[in-house]
Structures are given as structure tokens and as C-alpha cells.
Amino acid sequence: MLKKKKTEVYALGEHISMSADKARRVIDQIRGRSYEETLMILELMPYRACYPILKLVYSAAANASYNMGSSEANLVISKAEVNGGTTVKKLKPRARGRSFPIKRSTCHITIVMKDISLNDEYVKMNSLKKTRWKKKSTAMTYHDMYNSGGLWDKK
């Protein structure tokens, strides 16, 4: 029996004092990219959300090297999500005894990294299995999209 080896590690940052929408703007740029490419993108982007996300990416890579012994060159961000956290509500005193509410939003950021070198071994093992539903023959048809024989082809 083959024991399935763990291929994913994650880093979780909770109660980061930032709007979830502002953090999502940065997370959408790095989702699905490699570790080195992610570091370059995060260091060059001019947003405040980049620094806590960069710390989480470093932490996830350290988790991968410590827990699985994998190299940083083989890591890919497979899943990155931002969820809204708690909202800190305060009152700001104003003139004439009034007060205005202040809402300070927080977010939770989760970054999941996958080691693609371990994933290739499973692809090799699964390719040895015989597929039963594979089609016998596939015929390719070529369609000329520039010369469709319509009205506009005639001069």
C-alpha cells in the first residue's frame, strides 16, 4: 500500500489590520505563480498589503523546507485566499459632546504552497495505470477561419 506523501504546506495570518478588499488586490496577482516570481512581484508592487503577504510567503516556504525538506525552487502558490476578520469598533469624541464611530477592519490571509517535484512522482505512478474509457481514434478537422467562403471573400 502506498502512503500518500504530503505535498502542500500553508501559512495563516490572522487579524491583519487591513481591509480584505485591499489585500485581495495583491493576492490575485500572485495566485498560481512560483516562489521566486512571487517574491519579485511583492517587492516591486507599491501597495501596503505587500509586506504582510510577503512575510506569509516566507513563512510558508520555511514550513515547506522544514516539514517536507523541499527546495524553494519547486514551490508554487496553489491557493491563496483572503477572508474578512473581526471589525474593531471605537468611538471618536467630537465637539459638543457628540461622538463618531470608527470601524477598523481586519482580515485573515491563507497561503497554500505546493511542491511540484513531489507531484510529478504521482503523475508518473498514475500514468502506469491503464485507462479504460480512452477513445480508439480521434479525427481532427481543420477549419480555415480567414477564408470561410462567405460574402466578404469575393471581390
UniProtKB/Swiss-Prot annotation:
Record protein name field = Large ribosomal subunit protein uL22c
Major subcellular location class = plastid
Q: What does this protein do?
A: This protein binds specifically to 23S rRNA. The globular domain of the protein is located near the polypeptide exit tunnel on the outside of the subunit, while an extended beta-hairpin is found that lines the wall of the exit tunnel in the center of the 70S ribosome.
Any one biological process term the GO annotation gives:
translation
Q: Which InterPro entries match?
A: Ribosomal_uL22 (IPR001063), Ribosomal_uL22_bac/chlpt-type (IPR005727), Ribosomal_uL22_bac/org-type (IPR047867), Ribosomal_uL22_CS (IPR018260), Ribosomal_uL22_sf (IPR036394)
Family, as annotated: Belongs to the universal ribosomal protein uL22 family.
Cellular location of this protein? Plastid, Chloroplast
Q: Name one GO cellular component term.
A: chloroplast
